[in-house]
């Protein structure tokens, strides 16, 4: 019966995750009555951390930890030792949101209530640890554009599921190639630019991926929101500038030593700063925008971020090369 009831709740919801075996007692009971009840009850859960205090309509009004019950005298009333700092979870709450609540409030367990606010189950930290592992794995799979069961699916089905974002990626790659084609004459005149181009694109892509990973994770945990988005965008842009200047000096010196041309060193150094600043900026802005559009940034953001850093990197490097070297 419990299994059938659980299947009536949405998949990946608190209703599916919760345990129905719990200890609920009225507020007017004493510690002694509560202990006697637990000793006599054949349906207690094997392991539990908290007792839930309910009103006559079976709505949770407080909690008491098992250790606190055992430390108090038998005559003490439950409502005198209970905590009213409750975090009831709706049965329909998504398990990712549920895990965020546990993480933010350092909960050990939390009551689950139905639409009428009545206690129907409990979620414990043991269950939430599994959810956090599942969600982290799911986000990792999405960022790679693959599915969890790809290892066991037929080759054609796997290829079809991966083809969508590969098709989007090839369109963005052609856009980057179009930018390069605008500077054919420059590349023909200064072959060193063709040699150094991958460095600019690679550094921008890696810097953007670092920022993107932080932003996607912060969005998933609700640490990145409208209230602090501008501050995080500014911070990551400044980080990009610092790294850009540091690596610009390094790459500029290497390019100068390689080609014996100061101007080539200056061009790639300037392009490096521009691309890493842009990488820091778009690494936050793009996932935030996708999240606002209800598109999962873990799936789509990396493609668009890579496109921007490639286009900006090539445009800055080859554009500066055209202005300075020709």
Residue map of PLM features:
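Cytosolic regulatory modules rich in charged/polar residues
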Residues: 1-195
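Alpha-helical transmembrane segments and their membrane-interface boundaries
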Residues: 132, 136-281, 285-308, 316-326
């Amino acid at each position: 019966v419990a299994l059938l009831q659980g299947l009536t709740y949405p998949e990946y919801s608190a209703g599916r995750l919760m345990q129905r075996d719990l200890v609920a007692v009225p507020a007017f009971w004493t510690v002694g009555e509560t202990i006697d009840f637990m000793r006599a009850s054949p349906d207690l859960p094997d392991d539990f951390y908290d007792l839930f205090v309910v009103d006559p309509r079976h709505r949770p009004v407080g909690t008491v930890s098992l250790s606190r019950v055992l430390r108090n005298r038998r005559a003490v009333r439950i409502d005198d030792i209970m905590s009213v700092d409750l975090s009831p979870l709706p049965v329909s709450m998504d398990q990712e949101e549920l895990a965020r609540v546990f993480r933010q409030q350092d909960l050990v367990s939390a009551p689950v209530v139905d639409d009428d606010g009545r206690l129907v189950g409990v979620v414990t930290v043991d269950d939430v640890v599994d959810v956090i592992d599942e969600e982290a794995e799911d986000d990792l799979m999405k960022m790679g554009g693959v599915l969890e069961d790809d290892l066991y699916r037929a080759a054609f089905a796997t290829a079809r599921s991966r083809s969508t974002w590969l098709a989007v990626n090839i369109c963005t790659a052609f856009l980057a190639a179009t930018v390069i084609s605008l500077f054919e004459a420059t590349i023909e005149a200064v072959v060193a630019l063709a040699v150094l181009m991958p460095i600019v694109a690679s550094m921008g892509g890696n810097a953007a991926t670092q920022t993107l990973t932080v932003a996607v994770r912060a969005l998933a945990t609700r640490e990145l929101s409208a209230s602090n988005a501008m501050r995080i965008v500014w911070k990551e842009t400044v980080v990009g500038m610092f790294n850009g200047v540091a690596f610009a000096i390094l790459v500029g010196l290497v390019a100068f030593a390689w080609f014996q041309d100061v101007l080539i060193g200056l061009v790639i150094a300037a392009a490096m700063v521009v691309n890493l600043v842009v990488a820091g900026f778009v690494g936050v802005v793009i996932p935030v925008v996708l999240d606002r559009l209800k598109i999962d940034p873990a799936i789509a953001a990396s493609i668009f971020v890579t496109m921007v850093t490639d286009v900006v990197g090539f445009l800055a490097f080859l554009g500066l090369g055209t202005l300075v070297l020709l």
